[in-house]
Each structure stands twice: as C-alpha cells, then as structure tokens.
Amino acid sequence: FTRVIGEMVQGTDIDFITVDLNPLHIERSKVVTKGLSNIEYHVMSSEDFLSSGEGQIDFLYMDTGDMHPIEPTAELHLREAQLIAGCDIISKNGVILIDDVRNTTPKIVDNEESDYGKAKYSIPFLLKNGFDLVMDEYQVVLQKK
C-alpha cells in the first residue's frame, strides 16, 4: 500500500504522510519507498498525530492495531475516530479507508459478535458525526459530508 500510494503522488503537490508507533515499520516504509518524494515519515502514536493539528486530510488510511485481542484495538480505533471528528481534520468530501474491518480473527479467537471487529465502535461513531458510508466490505470507506 505504501509503495503504491507513494508512486501515485509523484509529480503532484500531494503530501503523503505515514505514521507508525513502531520505528521498524517506518524503516520498512522508507525501504519500500526509496527514491520517491513527497513522503513524510513519523514515528509516533496515531492519537498524537491526529491531535497535532497538522492541517486537513483528504484521504486517511486507518490500519490500526492488532486483531487479537480485539477490544483494546477497538477502543483505540474509537479514540482515533473521536479525534478525527473532534479536531475536524478531514476535509469536506474527504475519505477514510479502514482496513481489516471484516477480518475473521476476532470472531474466531475472541468470539466477537460484531461484524466490524476493530471498527465496531468507530464506524457507528463516525456515522453519527458527519460521515457517510460509501463501501462496506472487508475494508470500509467513509466520506465526510
């Protein structure tokens, strides 16, 4: 994903920002995007980044946390959603792509009832706070009204 999006922004005025708490993941991102420009890398928590006031985001790819145990990841995902809505950081008509929503691990390992797994709290919250559901499959796409 990082390489593909990195290639897509080449020759544009689009800034591509990748954030991860794990420095090894950021180093891997740097390796796979070597030679590309318009990319910023930040080793920090998603919550710190989202609350930093870095301006408006047109496209946000959320790939938060682990699939097991699911509850801490779902709670983090909700906190991220609260920051997204509360700080008004998504531009009008901006898009959020949430990955791994329908991953079956939480149902199998944690006996999770929700079909939304790690996004079981964040999706309902975002839908009540200015976002529309555009696609509801393995990945979920939301768009700001």
Language model regions located:
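A generic alpha-to-beta junction signature in SAM-dependent methyltransferases
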Residues: 9-10, 53, 88-90
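Generic enzyme active-site microenvironment
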Residues: 18, 61, 97-98
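A short acidic, Gly/Pro-enriched loop at the edge of an enzyme's catalytic core
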Residues: 52-59
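Conserved proline-anchored active-site loop of SAM-dependent methyltransferases
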Residues: 59-65
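C-terminal substrate-binding/active-site "lid" region of AdoMet-derived donor-dependent transferases
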Residues: 66-145
